[in-house]
């Protein structure tokens, strides 16, 4: 099944992340397991982050709330891909941004909404007023069944 069709079929963060891992393994021959996803109320200028040395990915709930459809899935894919690359040990932000774009371009094609998401980010539809909010409480929420692991793995 083509990757775009798989993304369209994705039901949740775990399905999208499985696709992220497939792209990275196929393109870079890199792979890791045991990651956990948290949704948090981050400042609107932050899409997500991976605390180095952890198994955690933290996604900004505020940027993605109330969004649906393929555009939403494309942004989630691009953000999770970016943070997954960090979790694999790539720490240079510019290098990771370029690699995120290249992987999306190579795997989805130039006209894909996933490639567009790597260029615009989830901030494209925000207004100036959205950025004027006070800093929120982080309020982390663990996303259950995020990583689909084939075979056994002990956390």
Model-derived features with residue positions:
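Active-site recognition of the HExxH zinc-binding catalytic motif
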Residues: 74-90, 97
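Residue-level marker of regulatory loop/turn positions in helix-turn-helix DNA-binding domains and
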Residues: 69, 73
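Metalloprotease/metallohydrolase-associated module, dominated by Zn2+-dependent proteases
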Residues: 1-58, 65-67, 91-155
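A generic structural motif
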Residues: 63-65, 84-85
């Amino acid at each position: 099944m083509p990757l775009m069709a798989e993304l369209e079929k994705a039901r949740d963060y775990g399905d999208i992340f499985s696709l992220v891992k497939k792209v990275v393994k196929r393109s870079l021959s890199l792979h890791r397991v045991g990651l956990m996803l948290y949704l948090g109320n981050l400042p609107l200028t932050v899409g997500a982050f991976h605390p180095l040395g952890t198994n955690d990915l933290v996604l900004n709930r505020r940027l993605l709330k109330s969004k649906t459809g393929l555009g939403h899935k494309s942004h989630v894919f691009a953000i999770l891909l970016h943070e997954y690359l960090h979790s694999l040990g790539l720490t240079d932000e510019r290098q990771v941004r370029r690699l995120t774009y290249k992987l999306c371009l190579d795997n989805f094609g130039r006209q894909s909404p996933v490639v567009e998401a790597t260029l615009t980010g989830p901030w494209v539809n925000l207004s100036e007023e959205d950025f004027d909010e006070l800093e929120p409480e982080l309020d982390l929420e663990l996303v259950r069944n995020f990583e689909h692991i084939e075979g056994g793995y002990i956390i």
